[in-house]
């Protein structure tokens, strides 16, 4: 992995009681030795693999103003990180769920792009076996479960300040209040809505297939083509490119997919991040609620799975063997 650390600083927030978060600030930057580089490479990998929301700085963002001064050489990176950690402590202290953690600021390069990554990591205890086969306690950074993380694409921010996607952050599992506090600290608001872009793509694909007057099998083949392309982009960490996708669908219609989406006004970006959960709808139907979870391949609709919208009834012909076995055992037992 071609990751080069420019500057990295660690600080700590310690929760002493319900009211106070103690601030512990380093007096110097971390030396980017092999261990530190390995840690950042792992954090970069874990973060890149997670679903993210996109945002941009508000005009009054204190962090953005301080970062701009640091980038212009008017403030040292260590001083910037120390002041930012103080603001983070003040913001976090407003919330009853406030917990401590290791606060990390890292400015690094990856594939010719400069980033600033900000994270609050948990420092956990565990056990290890030493060379004498004795058990000893140890501490480690819980990188795999890091959920308070944001990353600023410094290259995008500085070359295209009107962008709505140079800032990314984790959203969802940690809860709304946690996301709110971190966005307040960053002085940022949500920008590009990747899920909405992916939903728009799915609708455009279905409309494109209908416009081309494809039969059911051909429509499903088109969806499978789109899914294969998008999933390949997702696995490679690349964005969905409308021009490239249009080339994949070149034989579907006389008009290109890109021309079709522009003419119909879907308002899709020329490129946008793939959203795994939304794209899955191209090949599967899934839903849950009221104690029921259903998931089946889209191609089975109308063949083995039938839906009657008038009665909202789903009929399944031929149940999976393991489900059938459970049903038979339960009914034969009289329960």
Swiss-Prot record:
Keyword annotations of the record:
Cytoplasm
- Superkingdom, natural source: Bacteria
Q: Name one Pfam family in it.
A: NA37
Protein localization: Cytoplasm, Nucleoid
Concerning InterPro entries, the annotation shows:
Nucleoid_associated_NdpA
Q: Which GO terms describe its cellular component?
A: bacterial nucleoid; cytoplasm
GO MF term (any one):
single-stranded RNA binding
Q: Which NCBIfam families match?
A: PRK00378.1 (NF001557)
Similarity field: Belongs to the YejK family.
Q: What is this protein called?
A: Nucleoid-associated protein KPK_1538
């Amino acid at each position: 992995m071609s990751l080069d650390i420019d500057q990295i600083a660690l600080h700590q927030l310690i929760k002493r009681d319900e009211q106070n978060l103690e601030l512990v600030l380093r007096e110097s930057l971390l030396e980017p030795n092999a261990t530190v580089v390995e840690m950042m490479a792992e954090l970069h990998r874990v973060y890149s693999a997670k679903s993210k929301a996109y945002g941009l700085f508000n005009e009054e963002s204190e962090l953005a103003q301080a970062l701009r001064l640091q980038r212009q050489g008017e403030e040292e990176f260590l001083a910037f990180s120390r002041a930012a950690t103080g603001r983070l402590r003040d913001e976090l202290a407003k919330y009853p769920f406030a917990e401590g953690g290791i606060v990390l600021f890292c400015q690094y390069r990856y594939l010719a792009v400069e980033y600033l990554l900000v994270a609050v990591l948990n420092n956990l205890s565990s056990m290890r076996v030493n060379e004498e086969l004795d058990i000893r306690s140890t501490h480690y950074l819980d990188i795999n479960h890091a959920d308070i993380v944001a990353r600023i694409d410094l290259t995008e921010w500085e070359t295209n300040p009107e962008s709505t996607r140079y800032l990314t952050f984790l959203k969802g599992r940690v809860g709304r209040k946690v996301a709110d506090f971190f966005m307040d600290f960053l002085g940022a608001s949500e920008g590009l809505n990747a899920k909405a872009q992916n939903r728009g793509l799915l609708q455009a694909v279905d409309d494109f297939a209908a416009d081309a007057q494809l039969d059911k099998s051909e429509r499903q083949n088109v969806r499978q083509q789109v899914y294969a392309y998008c999933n390949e982009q997702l696995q490679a960490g690349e964005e969905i490119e409308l021009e490239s996708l249009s080339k994949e669908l070149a034989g579907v219609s006389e008009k290109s997919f890109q021309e079709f989406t522009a003419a119909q006004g879907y308002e899709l970006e020329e490129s946008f991040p793939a959203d795994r959960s939304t794209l899955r709808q191209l090949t599967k139907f899934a839903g849950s609620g009221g104690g029921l979870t259903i998931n089946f391949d889209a191609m089975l609709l109308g063949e083995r799975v039938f839906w009657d919208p008038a009665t909202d009834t789903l009929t399944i012909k031929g149940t999976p063997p393991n489900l059938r076995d459970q049903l038979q055992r339960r009914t034969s037992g009289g329960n």
